Amino acid sequence: MSKVMETKQQVVTEIADKLRASKSTIVVDYRGLTVSEATELRKQLREAGVEFKVYKNSLTRRAAESAEMAELNEFLTGPNAIAFSNEDVVAPAKVLNDFAKDHEALEIKAGVIEGKLVTLDEVKAIATLPSREGLLSMLLSVLQAPIRNLALATKAVADQKEEQGA
């Protein structure tokens, strides 16, 4: 096998592994972004723990078929970049959606969330969800509320008895 074929096969394997391992994968069309805008987008994604790469569509198609995500192939036309997140399902959708609001040149095409193909509308809906940390803080506040209310009620009763005794 030629050196070029080996290199392409390694890239296909790399993409397929990333598709299988990622909890959230978003495909975007970055045509029209300036270099500074693309750099800013990469920085924001990196800070969110998201990997952002540009691959040839033909190699990405082979990798998607290898990873049993062939339905993604219909969105692989034109210049595409792919955002992979192994940690947070919401992070790539949130960062890309927020960036696309300010920069019309960035077009979200589709994504794969936990192995399921999602459309542009679903990606936008996912982007509105709070992050994992936000959900955990909401859960903790819900769990603490009854205890806090009990403590306040007990304190109010104690204060009332103290006033009656004085």
Curated annotation (Swiss-Prot):
Q: CDD domains per the record?
A: Ribosomal_L10
Quick one: a GO biological-process term for this protein?
Answer: translation
Write one Gene Ontology MF term: structural constituent of ribosome
InterPro entries given in the database record: Ribosomal_uL10, Ribosomal_uL10-like_sf, Ribosomal_uL10_bac, Ribosomal_uL10_bac_type, Ribosomal_uL10_CS_bac
- The intrachain disulfides are none
- Its domain of life reads Bacteria
Listed A to Z, the keywords are: Ribonucleoprotein, Ribosomal protein, RNA-binding, rRNA-binding
Give the record's GO CC terms: cytosolic large ribosomal subunit
* Subunit field text: Part of the ribosomal stalk of the 50S ribosomal subunit. The N-terminus interacts with L11 and the large rRNA to form the base of the stalk. The C-terminus forms an elongated spine to which L12 dimers bind in a sequential fashion forming a multimeric L10(L12)X complex.
Q: Which family does it belong to?
A: Belongs to the universal ribosomal protein uL10 family.
**Record HAMAP family:** Ribosomal_uL10 (MF_00362)
What the protein does comes down to:
Forms part of the ribosomal stalk, playing a central role in the interaction of the ribosome with GTP-bound translation factors.
Q: What is this protein called?
A: Large ribosomal subunit protein uL10
Q: Which organism is it from?
A: Bacillus cereus (strain ATCC 14579 / DSM 31 / CCUG 7414 / JCM 2152 / NBRC 15305 / NCIMB 9373 / NCTC 2599 / NRRL B-3711)
Record lineage: Bacteria, Bacillati, Bacillota, Bacilli, Bacillales
* Gene designation per UniProt: rplJ
